[in-house]
Amino acid sequence: MAAVKYKLLKDYVPPIYRQQSVSLEFFLDPEKTILKSKIQFSRDNGIPTDLVLQGENILLSYLKIDGKNIGLDLLTFGKHTLVIPKKFLGPRDFQVEMENILDPSTNKTLEGLYLSEGIFVTQCEPEGFRKICYSLDRPDVLSTYTVRIHGSYAHMLSNGNPITISNNYSEWRDPFPKPSYLFALVAGDLIFDEETFTTLSGKLVKIKIFYQKEHIGKANHALICIKKAMAWDEINYGREYDLDVFNIVAVDDFNAGAMENKGLNIFNSKYILYDDETSTDSDFALTEAIIAHEYFHNWTGNRVTCRDWFQLCLKEGLTVFREQEYMEDQLEKEISRINQTDFLIKNQFKEDAGPLSHSARPTRYLEINNFYTATVYEKSAEIIRMLKKIIGREKFLEGMDQFFKNQDGCACTLEDFQKDFELVLGKNLEKFFKWFHEPGTPKLAISEKFVGKNYKVTFRQEKPINHLKYSNKVMPITYKILNSKGQFLQPEKTLVLDQKTTSIELKNLSKKPAISLLNSFSAPVIVEFKQSIDDLFAILEFETDFTSVWMTKKKLDYIALEKIASDQPNVENIISRVYEILINKMDKRSLLAKLLEPLNDNEYFSRLLETTTPDPKAIQTDLRKYEDLYKRYFKEFSITYFKSFIHNRQYLRENSNYQERLLACALIFLNRGTNFLDDFLDIIFNTSNNMSLKVSCLVNYIGRNDKKENIKKFYLQYGKNKVLLNKWFATQIQYSTPKLAFDRLRELTTHSDFNMFNPNNFHSVIGTFAKRNFHAFHQKDGSGYKEIADWIKKIDPENPQIAASTTKAFEQIKFLPNIYRKKAKATLNTLSKGNNLSKDTSEILNKIEASL
């Protein structure tokens, strides 16, 4: 077996050759697309060397240099490269002209040029362009592009501005130099909706969203969102759109959520097509967030791009943070922050604790596709949020202006970003930027003392779980101090902790107060603080920061579960007091809905692994006991609420707002597995015109023999809608008991509407089983592990990205009891041996196996 060769950050070498301009001419055919390319190269000063181009599975017909034909037998073809000897190259500038043949119809990887239901689509980030054309496929080589597309399709699109649009060909020119990963082409019999936007400088931009005709009427929300994002970026960051057109295409077969190709964004259709009756309220918000994210990339990613893929944290961290700021302005700011924090803890904290942990800016990788992670995206965004909190909004925007000014049109590094901010601030930021360079979630240990009339709180940094190396970080700790009556003894303050330990002190107090920590989750840390239950109750009742209230409720959940797990008394005292506090928050329905969300198995497992070896069976038993107690306390509240909800016909979209529906859905979910709401739910399921409520009812019906017809009815009514079909698939898998989940898995994967090569289908069934049905996956006999390993083996040869993503379901096996680890290890060992797995999947698999 050949030694694994990692790419290392320290090995970066600037390119000797540059691509000044790229001209591509496509003659589209599903099975035999011909591409003629002309690339103008220049060589930087230095000794001439061979020209090494990247390319995979490319059938080259001919190659010319400055018009002179070069025999293919004089070139060196590697598995992923084409080497042109230096003797054929010009002294400084020269043109390479090539023709190659592609077969989009057989491309199941969904990278490069492929077909999605008859539509030609490309995906080039990070290294897909090399599957289209031999080139310098690296992000620090920026070129202008001219693209001509021949074919008999209604619309043939590429980056930049249209030069010519005719019946049988189109031509596009992008005047802004870009790396190859931002190239895009789409062609097919699509229809479109359009709008216009006038920038602050007076430029008129045409906006079009292209989609298949079956989706007519579903692009209006997206068009509104694009215009809002454009205006927001102008007002908040001074960034105008720079092309004459902004096009988006929705396709059904797409590995990612969306892609920010310059002037031609490509979206997974589930994240952009929306209508009031068949989309949920969360779909509404998610569509807006993803549209904003991809649009904001126009500056943080496109105009300013990455020098190499180790800098991915910069473009994605900045863009995720900007997207988060935007969404806080569009929806309820505090609820948005709860959702961001919830996602971070459930995904990034879990990643940081396991064998796939890595720094936000990694120093090595085997397969770059594997580093599109929660750490690179969400943790990087949290680091940038902390920077803004510490230096203030005004200085942060000055730093961003400096960054855009210095790096526009460049492929830059994290260090460039750091230097631009240092220039504005006049201070060294090296210690703060350590956040990007070390893996793991820091622990913040808190202790408090009340002696005499003095209250002292001490903060101490500790190393993360499973990481021996740790440098003390600079972090903002936002806090409030309140008494048991809800009076705040001082306004919100932010302590910048820049050493291992520090303290704050309040004097001349008559009684011990309570401290409410990490308001708005000001730093991505794990807090270790044995705070009294009375203090937690005071924070839950009186704190005005929603995120702190939400985190406090979680702490009380864990305390109650600890008591259940160890058969301690007084669990109901906690639940009773929480109930009394929560029912008085009806004026904050969105917050109440978030507080009513029960802990899920994965969440509880992640919490337990910090201190013990969690047993899946015990987790299930304890959580069910806890949920049953909660249901009992909230039963009358739920019945009373739904009587009013039904009486006022608030199940109709026009009679309610999303806050009201959010609370209704939370109560339905809280009471799943019961039947005392059935009369209300049947009315909602059969007559509501809001999909959030219908899907919540569907969740409640899973596993109930008396509700099988309702589950079937949902499919018959909405099965032709691909987004709802996948919700129907996923709901049956996620909320089934283990035995039923296995049955459903086999039933749904043989369903006539299931296509394993469609990423949305695969994730909704296989991915949901592996990652969202904790107890079905973690079976003592190892059957869940074997089931998923078999699917990984099936999909890996066709789509390595999906296979690698699914393999990550095994990342926390190391924390389970030995009986589970042994079964998983045997399964993974069988999977890794003799299957010739892709680099994507092997990298993930090897790291997990090494941890067992």
Where are these regions (language model features)?
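N-terminal, polar/Ser/Thr-rich
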Residues: 1-34, 110-121, 130, 429-433
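Extended, low-hydrophobicity, Ser/Thr/Pro/Gly-biased non-transmembrane segments
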Residues: 17, 99-196, 221, 432, ...
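Surface-exposed beta-strand/loop patches in extracellular or lumenal glycoproteins
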Residues: 40-59, 134-137, 143-152, 415, ...
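Beta-strand-rich binding/interaction modules
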Residues: 59-66, 428-431, 439-517, 639
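Short acidic/polar inter-strand loop motif in beta-rich domains
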Residues: 101-109, 464, 521-526
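Hydrophobic alpha-helical and helix-loop surface patches within well-folded domains
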Residues: 172, 209-458, 666
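Long, ordered, helix-rich scaffold segments
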Residues: 345-346, 374, 469-471, 482, ...
